[in-house]
A protein has these predicted regions:
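Secreted/periplasmic proteins
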Residues: 2-123
């Protein structure tokens, strides 16, 4: 194994993960604003563009679109949840503000890979 191969593998491993190969999904979203540690070990920053998802890999990035107003934001998955029936993703307060559903508390969203490789539209 060459030093160049090892360096290339290390660089690839450090790149932000995309939810590659993931399908577009639609469902409920809510928001939360804790300051405790997330499943990834980092402290939750309520204003960061982050989210909790039950199965997407930690560190992956997804585009979330609010289906009621078509606003979108790219978030990084850094936590696990939500654990409420009918909810697919829990967004940080900052992401929810950008999506325009703070006062409602929840909304219906489309979740797709941030790289645009999603396979369908929920609208």
């Amino acid at each position: 194994v060459t030093a160049a191969a090892l360096m290339g593998a290390a660089m690839l491993a450090s790149l932000p993960a995309q939810a590659a190969g993931a399908k577009t999904t639609c469902g409920g979203a809510s928001w939360y604003a804790l300051t405790s540690r997330t499943a990834s070990g980092e402290r939750m920053n309520p204003m960061a563009m982050t989210a909790a998802h039950k199965t997407l890999p930690l560190g992956s990035k997804v585009k979330v679109t609010n289906l009621s107003n078509r606003r979108s934001v790219v978030v990084r998955i850094n936590d696990r949840g939500p654990f409420v029936k009918g909810r697919m993703i829990d967004l940080s307060k900052g992401a929810a503000q950008r999506l325009g559903f703070i006062s409602a508390g929840h909304t219906r969203v489309q979740i797709e890979p941030a790289d645009g490789s999603g396979t369908r539209d929920c609208a």
